[in-house]
């Protein structure tokens, strides 16, 4: 059974300061408002409605926390880049997000979800740069990969991996599809490492 299928909703917080105690391990998920973040979380956790999907991009302006166990959490950050969100809210959120990435001790990795057809937009790059500056590893998931044929998919993946070298940090890029599960195993391998699951399993085998 997947570790992630045990995810349970804990709380919704209006900003970083309302999160639970800064202890244990957490991994944050971030992405543009139409990048398919909620669908990816639902696929990862094998739960159809753990993270609420919305036809209206930018609807979720709360931070949602999902517990895997007492010490491990998935953090669902609000989608960014949606034009109808007032500028004052955008700026406040960007400041709060920067502080979270740089100061949160329990944060062990950042998953950035990007539509495979439009990766590395300005805010995606800014987010990755913040994470790299804070010595955080980044997993970039090229979502909606099912929308491209195999050849085009591979070309986009190679292009994105080449582009990621410019960040000069621990940035891994994989394909992902919430629809058919493409790339789920690669995603889980990275998360297992961040959460210490891989280490736990090695100890059990010894």
Swiss-Prot record:
Q: Which residues bind GTP?
A: 31-38, 58-62, 76-79, 143-146, 176-178
Q: Which Gene3D superfamilies match?
A: P-loop containing nucleotide triphosphate hydrolases
Tell me if Metal-binding is a UniProt keyword of this record: yes
Give the CC-aspect GO terms.
Answer: cytosol
Its needed co-factors are: Mg(2+)
> What GO terms are given for molecular function?
GTP binding; metal ion binding
Which SUPFAM superfamilies does the UniProt entry name for this protein? P-loop containing nucleoside triphosphate hydrolases
Stretches assigned to the EngB-type G domain: 23-197
Report which superkingdom the organism of origin falls in: Bacteria
Supply the alphabetized keyword list.
Cell cycle, Cell division, GTP-binding, Magnesium, Metal-binding, Nucleotide-binding, Septation
| Listed PROSITE patterns | G_ENGB (PS51706)
User: Record's InterPro entries?
Assistant: G_ENGB_dom (IPR030393), GTP-bd (IPR006073), GTP-bd_ribosome_bio_YsxC (IPR019987), P-loop_NTPase (IPR027417)
Binding-site residues, Mg(2+): 38, 60
Provide one Gene Ontology biological process annotation: division septum assembly
Q: What's the family? A: Belongs to the TRAFAC class TrmE-Era-EngA-EngB-Septin-like GTPase superfamily. EngB GTPase family.
Described by its record, this protein's role is as follows: Necessary for normal cell division and for the maintenance of normal septation.
Q: What is this protein called?
A: Probable GTP-binding protein EngB
Task: State which gene encodes it.
Answer: engB
């Amino acid at each position: 059974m997947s570790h992630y299928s045990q995810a349970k909703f804990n709380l919704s917080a209006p900003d970083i300061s309302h999160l639970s105690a800064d202890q244990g391990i957490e991994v944050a998920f971030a992405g543009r408002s139409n990048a398919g973040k909620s669908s990816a979380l639902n696929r990862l956790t094998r739960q159809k409605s753990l993270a609420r999907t919305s036809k209206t991009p930018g609807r979720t302006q709360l931070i949602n926390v999902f517990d895997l166990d007492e010490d491990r959490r998935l953090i669902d950050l609000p989608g960014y880049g949606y034009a109808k969100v007032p500028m004052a809210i955008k700026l406040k959120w960007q400041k709060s997000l920067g502080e979270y990435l740089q100061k949160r001790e329990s944060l062990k990795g950042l998953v950035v979800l990007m539509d495979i057809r439009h990766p590395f937009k300005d805010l995606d790059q800014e987010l990755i740069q913040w994470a790299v500056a804070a010595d955080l590893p980044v997993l970039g998931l090229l979502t909606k990969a099912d929308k491209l044929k195999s050849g085009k998919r591979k070309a986009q993946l190679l292009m994105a991996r080449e582009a990621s070298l410019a960040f000069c940090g621990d940035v891994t890029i994989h394909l992902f599809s919430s629809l058919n599960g493409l790339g789920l195993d690669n995603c889980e391998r990275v998360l297992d490492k961040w959460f210490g699951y891989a280490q736990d399993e090695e100890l059990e085998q010894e």
